[in-house]
Amino acid sequence: MGQTITTPLSLTLDHWRDVQRIASNQSVDVKKRRWVTFCSAEWPTFNVGWPQDGTFNKDIITQVKIKVFSPGPHGHPDQVPYIVTWEAIAYDPPPWAKPFVHPQLSVSPSAPSAFSHEVSGPPTRSSLYPALTPTKSPSPKTQVLSDDGGPLIDLLSDDPPPYRGPENQPPAGRPTTTMQEMPRLPLKVPQEPSPMASRLRGRREHPAADSTTSQAFPLRTGGNGQLQYWPFSSADLYNWKNNNPSFSEDPGKLTALIESVLITHQPTWDDCQQLLGTLLTGEEKQRVLLEARKAVRGNDGRPTQLPNEINDAFPLERPDWDYTTPAGRNHLVLYRQLLLAGLQHAGRSPTNLAKVKGITQGPNESPSAFLERLKEAYRRYTPYDPEDPGQETNVSMSFIWQSAPDIGRKLERLEDLKSKTLGDLVREAERIFNKRETPEEREERIRRETEEKEERRRAENEQREKERDRRRHREMSKLLATVVSGQRQDRQGGERRRPQLDKDQCAYCKEKGHWAKDCPKKPRGPRGPRPQTSLLTLDD
């Protein structure tokens, strides 16, 4: 007999009870059929290195988890319980899985990860202020001298070549300018580059005496003291515009994109205008700017109507802010905050509760995905925030009433429904959704119900036939009884008792003075036999 090959997938199937116990500890429910489908058919298509037989490699599991938890239409909420359970097995393996779990290798600092591992929770809103990071003084470097005694440029050094002035043309694709032409705000470059941070602004920090300020500048100081600047590349703008819906179609998604650009790239006033002009139409841009100016607050913290304060905080013309000073940086930070507020307010449509009620759960849509669409409708068509605890009751009722019919009926029958939170309802809806029958099970149920219906119809037909025969037999019996009764009455009618006679009256001629035996009118002779009466039988 040949030996069987043990794979992570077959190992989990052999210990399925332990897998279900681990899933229960994670407050999720998993099914074996979907477990096999996701592992062997779905996750290999994510192109992150997931094999069809499964793996316990934590890095690959993390990449799959990032794909599953992706927001919007690119996510896979129905696969969340399965990848969470798989991750739990990899990070806390049971005894049968320990020999197959890969040890966690230390990651080299030169290979930063594009994403953070913790993605299960909702992303927190980042601040628009540049983060302050301490810097370390680098070790002294040896210089390589050229033939004329001057230092050669190290192409792998921390700094790009210095800006030589207007007499030299900048390299193609990387336009440069001087500080006098375009002042810039210091930018903090994250240790792990974001996929969106493709602007070549330099990714290393300069040493400085003050360790409490950000040292990653979009305007880099070269060897001759001049600053260098890299604006948005045309590829960035093209990708952002073509890979995202328009502001009118999905304002939430485009607002999230612009917010991430404001955080990761920290653009200047000119960059913001270029970004808005590329991603928004003229009418959309005007609406955003108008809402942003409405959000300007005065010294008392309330929205102001003073034109000078509005123009100072959110100018429509290019300001003369000096980004090398704290005042200039504060102006730019406030401008970004107001711009983000304008995007959020301009993205809200007029209040239309009918649009919210029109959001219903699809036949194969998971409750988590349906809840996200419902919350997005609340944000877009109502002035209410679905994340506000005061609106949780309204969102919960909409979730129950607009869920799929089978899920909604079971949610309405829950005990102590008033005390259930929205999270409790979603977990219960997920449990009901995961216990739904598969298409094969549905076909089998329909076939079984059809056979039972045919059997009942056949039994009813047989019962009706028996009842019809029984009724026909009763009618024939009644008819026979009627015929027999009529014949008996005829016979009794011929033999009816004669009327009462007097003592001297003849019974034959009814005359008085003699009896019937002496009646002269009565014929004399032998008496013949009486006629026989024929009876009708059932055979006749």
From Swiss-Prot:
Question: Where do the zinc-finger regions (CCHC-type) map?
Answer: 504-521
Motif PTAP/PSAP motif: positions: 109-112
Motif residue range(s): PPXY motif: 160-163
Enumerate the InterPro entries for this protein.
Answer: G_retro_matrix (IPR000840), G_retro_matrix_sf (IPR036946), Gag_p12 (IPR002079), Gag_P30 (IPR003036), Retrov_capsid_N (IPR008919), Retroviral_Gag-Pol_poly (IPR050462), Retrovr_matrix (IPR010999), Znf_CCHC (IPR001878)
Q: Where is the composition biased (Low complexity)?
A: 145-155
Q: Where is this site: Cleavage?
A: Y129, P130, F217, P218, L480, A481
The annotated regions of Basic and acidic residues compositional bias extend over: 437-468, 488-521
One GO term of the cellular component aspect? host cell plasma membrane
Keyword field: Capsid protein, Coiled coil, Host cell membrane, Host endosome, Host membrane, Host-virus interaction, Lipoprotein, Membrane, Metal-binding, Myristate, Phosphoprotein, RNA-binding, Viral budding, Viral budding via the host ESCRT complexes, Viral matrix protein, Viral nucleoprotein, Viral release from host cell, Virion, Zinc, Zinc-finger
Annotated GO biological processes are:
viral budding via host ESCRT complex
Which residues fall in a compositionally biased region of kind Polar residues? 134-144
Residues covered by region (Disordered): 107-222, 437-540
N-myristoyl glycine: lipidated positions: G2
What post-translational modification information does the record give?
A: RNA-binding phosphoprotein p12 is phosphorylated on serine residues.
> Which residues, renumbered to this chain, carry the PTM Phosphoserine?
S194
What terms describe the molecular function in GO for this protein?
RNA binding; structural constituent of virion; zinc ion binding
User: What residue ranges carry the coiled-coil annotation?
Assistant: 440-481
Please report, in chain numbering, the residue ranges of the motif LYPX(n)L motif. 128-132
What Pfam families does the entry give? Answer: Gag_MA, Gag_p12, Gag_p30, zf-CCHC
Q: Compositional bias (Pro residues) spans?
A: 159-173
Its protein name is: Gag polyprotein
